[in-house]
From Swiss-Prot:
Entry's family note: Belongs to the class I-like SAM-binding methyltransferase superfamily. RsmB/NOP family.
Compartment(s) where it occurs, according to its Swiss-Prot or TrEMBL record: Cytoplasm
Official protein name in the record: Ribosomal RNA small subunit methyltransferase B
GO CC term, one of those recorded: cytosol
Catalysed reactions listed for this entry: cytidine(967) in 16S rRNA + S-adenosyl-L-methionine = 5-methylcytidine(967) in 16S rRNA + S-adenosyl-L-homocysteine + H(+)
Biological source species: Pectobacterium carotovorum subsp. carotovorum (strain PC1)
Length: 429
């Protein structure tokens, strides 16, 4: 950590790295949080996530306040103005402090000559704030999504696309997965209540608990001992539908960061799990999760398209394929997805999913079960992908999961519910 720093300038740089360089916020933020004191880390996260969540609104406001946007080497100052407007409109930071710290950010970014400009734009926003926000509410920027994604969501869900978009724009709830090897869900709910933490059980997924308000993990009873894991309810549905059993050979493909790997081992502690991911760095997270929960799984780096290079001819009783996808179901947790994804990416992802799906199917034993899952809400990656797979593989049968949405189950993001997710359960004849 630097002895002195300007937090607003750091937030502006992070936003710029996401928007101009295409970097992932979840990868960037921990690196930059090390530049600030522990007490400032939550604020840095709030500013970065917040600006990316409401980006079109901030862009629209700046267009009304400035004749010409800052570009080129001054582009980071454009993002600094966004950080300032976000603070003034969305946070409880006293306006004088938000203004002063944001204006000083220009010095930290080595553009002291622009302090007056930034001060003027932010003060103008202060004066016109109510009028600007009212006008913006009637503009397409109010949906806070890129037009291509908005069009895809509206086409897929013509009757309730606005509800999905609204859920994407909200702050996500915090869900826990209770480790059934330590406590029943009811017992852990009692432990939370003793700590004054209000929580609610999920109606379908038997290990899932929603906190009334998010809290730091060190406040959770027994977190360091592995009593609970932070994992969205819909993500927990993958293992719920996989239904692993003791003694089975189980493959968790595209396993990082390991939430589903450890969930499999909680559900079937005597199973033999192979966790595979293409990203060596993210496999480190799988190992960390296994260590915290004191569990063992075989962890390998490998490309799902070429299983012969890593699975050594092994056959599996169950396979969980959490396929690479557009992540359009988890936008509320990762608002940068809206700006990192492009329309053309969807077809490329569908082709990649097909390749992995087809490549791994021969490694499922006859009578074995596969769950195909994504954290997408787009039909091309989900129901259509499974329909096409079934036409190519006569030895695949879809398991009826009791929904009318065959093939598979499509979960949509909901304010008090889980993220957007899709599951299809298949059995090999």
């Amino acid at each position: 950590m630097k002895s002195s720093y300007n937090l607003r300038s750091i937030a502006a740089k992070v936003v710029g790295q996401v928007l101009d360089q295409g970097q992932s916020l979840s990868a960037l933020l921990p690196v930059h949080q090390r530049e600030v004191s522990e007490k400032d880390r939550a604020l840095l996260q709030e500013l970065c996530f917040g600006v990316l969540r409401v980006l079109p609104q901030l862009e629209w406001c700046i267009q009304q306040l400035m004749a010409k946007p800052l570009t080129g080497k001054q582009r980071t100052l454009h993002y600094l103005i966004m950080v300032g407007i976000y603070q003034l409109h969305y946070t409880r930071i006293p306006p004088h402090a938000a203004l002063a710290e944001t204006v000083e950010g220009a010095v930290a970014l080595k553009r002291p000559q622009l302090k007056g400009l930034i001060n003027g734009v932010l003060r103008q926003f202060q004066r016109q704030q109510e009028e600007l926000i009212q006008r913006e509410a009637n503009h397409s920027s109010h949906y806070l999504h890129p037009s291509w994604l908005l069009a895809r969501i509206e086409h897929a869900y013509p009757n309730h696309w606005q509800t999905i978009v609204e859920a994407n724009n909200q702050r996500p709830p915090m869900w826990l997965r209770v480790n059934r090897l330590h406590h029943t869900r009811e017992a852990y709910l009692n432990l939370l209540a003793q700590e004054g933490i209000e929580a609610f059980p999920h109606t379908e997924f038997t290990d899932a608990i929603r906190l009334a308000s998010p809290c730091a993990v060190d406040q959770l009873p027994g977190f360091s001992q592995g009593w609970a894991t932070v994992q969205d309810a819909s993500a927990q549905g993958c293992v719920y539908w996989l239904d692993p059993q003791d003694g089975e050979q189980i493959l968790d493909l595209c396993a990082a960061p390991g939430g589903k790997t450890t969930h499999i081992l909680e559900a079937a502690p005597q199973s033999h799990v192979l966790a595979v991911d293409i990203d060596e760095t993210r496999l480190g997270r799988v190992k960390e999760n296994l260590l915290r929960l004191q569990m063992h799984a075989e962890v390998k780096q490998g490309d799902g398209r070429y299983p012969d290079s890593w699975c050594e001819g092994r056959m599996f009783d169950r396979i969980l394929l959490d396929a690479p996808c557009s992540a359009t179901g988890v936008i509320r947790r990762h608002p940068d997805i809206k700006w990192l994804r492009r329309d053309r990416d969807i077809e490329e992802l569908v082709a990649l999913q097909k390749e992995i799906f087809d490549a791994i199917w021969p490694h499922l034993k006859v009578g074995g079960t596969m769950v195909y899952a994504t954290c997408s809400i787009l039909p091309q990656e989900n129901a259509q992908q499974v329909t096409d797979f079934l036409t190519r593989h006569a030895d695949a049968t879809l398991v009826d999961t009791g929904t009318r949405e065959l093939p598979g189950i499509q979960m949509l993001p909901h304010a008090d519910g889980g993220d957007g997710f899709f599951y299809a359960k298949l059995v090999k004849n």
